[in-house]
């Protein structure tokens, strides 16, 4: 009586089943299980071992009506999400408007470019190999590179972005990996536009205040 049946559904040319991995703080990968796309927009997650944090309550059987919540958390969002979408949308055949993305678009993005998304989960063998390779040879900036590289990274982050349209007061930002004698450290760098307008100057002043308050 507890048996349930569903048809697998291919997503683009990526197939319908993919391994899910977790990468720990030491850069080691662990296979957590397998995610399958189902006909009708649902998904099934088959764990390699019991994972109560993922499968509980209505989802104890591993069946989800949409993208499982633990992967939906990696859905692109905010300023950085829109920057990510502009970079990958054409390649995966997804809309360039983030608000039009569906679960299939998120899955394709995670499979091809999900090696550096928030959290410790990586979907698919391709993304895992990219994540492991990035950990072996990180593109880190030294202190004396920041003055020249930060403006270029800010310009790249703003490419195609109307800075005045950021919803919810989102502050333009980019991510970087910084190298020092103590090792490497991930950073989120906020910035203001170059225009020199009163609004831009206010943002710059607020960022300085935020930096001082955080010291």
Where are these regions (language model features)?
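Phosphate/dinucleotide-binding and metal-coordinating scaffold of catalytic cores
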Residues: 1-215
């Amino acid at each position: 009586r507890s048996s349930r049946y569903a048809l697998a559904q291919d997503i683009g040319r990526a197939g319908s089943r993919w391994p899910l991995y977790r990468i720990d703080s030491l850069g080691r990968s662990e296979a957590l299980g397998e995610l399958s796309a189902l006909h009708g927009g649902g998904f099934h997650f088959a764990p390699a071992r019991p994972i109560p944090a993922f499968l509980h309550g209505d989802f104890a059987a591993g069946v989800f009506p949409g993208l499982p919540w633990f992967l939906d958390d990696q859905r692109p969002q905010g300023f950085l999400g829109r920057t990510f979408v502009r970079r990958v949308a054409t390649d995966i055949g997804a809309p360039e408007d983030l608000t039009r993305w569906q679960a299939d678009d998120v899955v394709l993005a995670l499979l091809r470019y999900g090696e550096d998304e928030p959290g410790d989960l990586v979907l698919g063998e391709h993304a895992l190999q990219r994540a492991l390779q990035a950990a072996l040879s990180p593109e880190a900036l030294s202190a004396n590179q920041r003055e020249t590289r930060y403006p270029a990274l800010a310009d790249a982050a703003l490419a195609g972005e109307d800075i005045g349209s950021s919803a919810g007061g989102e502050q333009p930002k980019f991510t970087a990996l910084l190298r020092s004698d103590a090792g490497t450290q991930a950073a989120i760098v906020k910035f203001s536009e170059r225009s020199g307008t009163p609004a831009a100057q206010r943002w710059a002043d607020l960022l300085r205040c935020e930096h001082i308050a955080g010291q």
